[in-house]
């Protein structure tokens, strides 16, 4: 018997969509979730909070293990361009990565599983700060899970390129490890007519960007792969003034932790070499936080794939590796488990101001996930 209806899920998702909040500031989101969870009161259901995160524990009748489900809750600093009756009420902020879907499905699955006391324990994690602060790592390092730490952990991420009704994953690495790169070069400014009296940081920075691309082409095993992308470059104040300072920011994406460490090391070496070559100062800040590769544990994932492949309502696809970053990789480095894609058929990509996932995926997601988690309780 299903306890969740599509209309209920759509209403919840639309309310959440209107109140996006960035990492560790999700106070209204947390209050909304706690109110919904309070409606599910059961003597075997316990709730804890950690900053803006929520942990819900369903105590089993005869627990042999604890099974975890994670949904991230933060939004993005993006001005929404989708015009609707439920568009974001917060200027400059949007649920452009589908975390409103993740929360709604998480609530739906929690409602389904909490109707009757299961045999095993279940932990539902509504996790803050996936996008900016690696909230999963922060919670783990702060011992937020305590005795509720799962023996297996599962999570999904919406995928705009897959049709509704599709689930996709793979054994092993699914998503990349990421690392933020911030570099500042400082030389000597001057008049454009007298370059010999100055030390041009535009020239130094462009050389650094070009040399950084040799990491991928000449240092990293081509079979393993990596991406080094600089997304911002700021220098100078006028067309006839040689820039004294240049700042760069970018990202490293790799499919293994080892390659990420190698790439970080080469970024530092190249930056120091540029500083010596151009006789300038350089500051390099590399911040990986908890964005480790998402590695799906073989036994958990094989079981998940076998289950989903047998469901008549599910179109299962083998997923290719993606350079997407996800802090669930940190939790999977501590607890075995699986992450997977859920198709939501949006014409626009994740992090797009026009991202508009199909709400028909909500009930499908609740039914598919609930069925799978219940199968683990047998």
From Swiss-Prot:
<feature type="active site" description="Proton acceptor">
    <location>
        <position position="131"/>
    </location>
</feature>
<dbReference type="InterPro" id="IPR002933">
    <property type="entry name" value="Peptidase_M20"/>
</dbReference>
<keyword id="KW-0028">Amino-acid biosynthesis</keyword>
<keyword id="KW-0378">Hydrolase</keyword>
<dbReference type="InterPro" id="IPR023905">
    <property type="entry name" value="AcetylDAP_deacetylase"/>
</dbReference>
<dbReference type="GO" id="GO:0019877">
    <property type="term" value="P:diaminopimelate biosynthetic process"/>
</dbReference>
<comment type="pathway">
    <text>Amino-acid biosynthesis; L-lysine biosynthesis via DAP pathway; LL-2,6-diaminopimelate from (S)-tetrahydrodipicolinate (acetylase route): step 3/3.</text>
</comment>
<comment type="similarity">
    <text>Belongs to the peptidase M20A family. N-acetyldiaminopimelate deacetylase subfamily.</text>
</comment>
<dbReference type="InterPro" id="IPR011650">
    <property type="entry name" value="Peptidase_M20_dimer"/>
</dbReference>
<protein>
    <recommendedName>
        <fullName>N-acetyldiaminopimelate deacetylase</fullName>
        <ecNumber>3.5.1.47</ecNumber>
    </recommendedName>
</protein>
<feature type="active site">
    <location>
        <position position="72"/>
    </location>
</feature>
<dbReference type="InterPro" id="IPR036264">
    <property type="entry name" value="Bact_exopeptidase_dim_dom"/>
</dbReference>
<dbReference type="GO" id="GO:0050118">
    <property type="term" value="F:N-acetyldiaminopimelate deacetylase activity"/>
</dbReference>
<dbReference type="Pfam" id="PF07687">
    <property type="entry name" value="M20_dimer"/>
</dbReference>
<comment type="function">
    <text>Catalyzes the conversion of N-acetyl-diaminopimelate to diaminopimelate and acetate.</text>
</comment>
<dbReference type="InterPro" id="IPR017439">
    <property type="entry name" value="Amidohydrolase"/>
</dbReference>
<keyword id="KW-0457">Lysine biosynthesis</keyword>
<dbReference type="Pfam" id="PF01546">
    <property type="entry name" value="Peptidase_M20"/>
</dbReference>
<keyword id="KW-0220">Diaminopimelate biosynthesis</keyword>
<dbReference type="GO" id="GO:0009089">
    <property type="term" value="P:lysine biosynthetic process via diaminopimelate"/>
</dbReference>
